[in-house]
Design a protein with these regions (language model features):
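Auxiliary, metal-adjacent structural segments of Zn-dependent hydrolase domains
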Residues: 44-92
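Hydrophobic membrane-insertion alpha-helices, especially the h-region
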Residues: 8-19
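Signal peptide cleavage region of secreted peptide precursors
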Residues: 19-30, 129
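Short alpha-helical catalytic segment bearing the HExxH-like zincin motif
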Residues: 113-122
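Active-site scaffold of zinc-dependent metalloenzymes
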Residues: 82-111, 125, 140-148
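Catalytic Zn2+-binding segment of zinc metalloproteases
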Residues: 122-138
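Positively charged n-region of N-terminal signal peptides that target proteins for export
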Residues: 1-6
Length: 169
């Protein structure tokens, strides 16, 4: 019984250490992303407005939270986010949206990819959805994690996948 209690105590300590290490690391990773951000409302606003219109058209009544940040950021300048196209920081917090889009990715993306990245990141923060696994069956879906692979998809593909996502909720 004593060995069980010691094992349980060690397991609890390990879990606590992992939790606080992740929490501390995540906060340190976020600061540079915020510092590298800049205003981009005019370019992103039409995509954001379309997302909320599409939600409403599919019977999903979500409003824009008061704490709403959606900006471009030089994510490639930060070692921990250099390979990200976008970062969503308001997942599981319905009162907050905090999203940063890699400006270089945005510049290289076609129109369809731009819609995918905006809907993908907003689906994390507004709908609290997780990424899908990166396998062939999920290719084309909004929550697929590799938007850069969507350079051959057209707006019709996006519209179909957006409707499929919203109907599944």
């Amino acid at each position: 019984m004593k060995e069980f209690k010691i094992g349980l105590l060690l397991l609890t300590l390990i879990i606590a250490m992992l939790y606080f290490t992740e929490k501390f690391t995540s906060n340190n990773d976020i600061k540079p992303v915020r510092n590298l951000a800049y205003e981009s409302n005019e370019e992103l606003k039409p995509y954001i407005n379309k997302f909320f219109r599409d939600l409403n058209n599919h019977g999903i009544n979500k409003s824009i939270p008061k704490d709403f940040i959606f900006k471009f950021s030089d994510l490639e300048s930060n070692k921990t986010t250099s390979h990200y196209h976008g970062v969503s920081l308001g997942h599981d917090d319905d009162d907050k949206v905090e999203i940063y889009i890699n400006k270089n990715s945005w510049s290289s993306f076609n129109k369809t990819q731009r819609y995918y990245i905006v809907y993908h990141e907003l689906s994390h923060d507004i709908l609290n959805l997780d990424d899908l696994s990166e396998n062939e069956a999920n290719y084309g879906k909004i929550m697929y994690p590799s938007i850069s692979k969507y350079d051959n998809l057209k707006m019709n593909d996006f519209v179909k996948n957006m409707k499929d996502l919203f109907k599944s909720l």
